[in-house]
Regions:
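Hydrophobic, Leu/Ile/Phe/Ala-enriched alpha-helical segments that form helix-helix packing faces
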Residues: 23, 66, 70, 118-119, ...
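Short coil/loop linkers at secondary-structure junctions
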Residues: 28-30, 72-76, 160, 180
Length: 201
């Protein structure tokens, strides 16, 4: 895919967050090698157009780069990623909170996104159904992902086993936004879909 401004921006954001955390932990890491690997992965990646989840696609690419260009285990890379993003104040502002995320006014846009995703214009992009919670449900917003861009990217890069670590990041992000995420299965673990259910804490 084209390595444009958006991919550079997300890459810079993830790289700076992780490298600040690496410095705190006094880790001996080749920053340049990680950055170059990220760029290489993004350029080789299948295009997903102007996907709403481009940030997640880039997050997956950077996680692969971290694993390839550091001596750290996947678990240690996950912890570095998690702690780096958690300590980034700008990231907290960018992800927002439960009130903004669960705003009913966003539902028409989400439903259009879902309909567009089922056209499968881009092989690696996410395909999603939106589930609106009812008063009888214990969630307000649900997603059933039938295709996962991160899983596709990891599979293309020959490291599908790394996808499950990024699944755990969803709980970190939900916690930052003061939301409760319930999920019973993921594509990364061999299921047919990922069933996200979000509610307020």
């Amino acid at each position: 895919m084209e390595y444009g401004f958006t991919q550079k921006l997300f890459g810079y954001f993830y790289h700076s967050s992780c490298m600040k955390q690496a410095a705190k932990q006094k880790l001996d890491i080749n920053k340049k090698a990680i950055k170059q690997e990220y760029v290489s992965i993004m350029k080789n990646a299948k295009d997903i157009g102007k996907s709403r989840l481009m940030s997640s696609y880039c997050m997956g690419a950077y996680f692969i780069a971290l694993n390839r260009k550091t001596p750290l285990s996947p678990e240690a890379c996950y912890e570095l990623y998690k702690d780096g993003l958690s300590s980034n104040k700008l990231f907290h502002i960018a992800v927002g909170n439960a009130n903004s995320y669960l705003d009913k006014k966003k539902m028409p846009g989400r439903l259009k996104w879902s309909a567009d995703s089922h056209l499968r214009r881009y092989e690696n992009d996410w395909v999603v159904d939106i589930i609106e919670g009812t008063p009888q449900d214990d969630f307000e917003l649900g997603y059933d992902y039938h295709t996962c861009g991160i899983c596709n990217l990891c599979r293309d890069e020959g490291c599908f086993e790394l996808a499950k670590y990024l699944c755990r990041m969803d709980y970190v992000l939900a916690d930052m936004m003061q939301m409760k995420l319930t999920r019973t299965k993921t594509i990364a673990e061999g299921a047919d879909l990922c069933d996200f259910r979000y509610g307020r804490k």
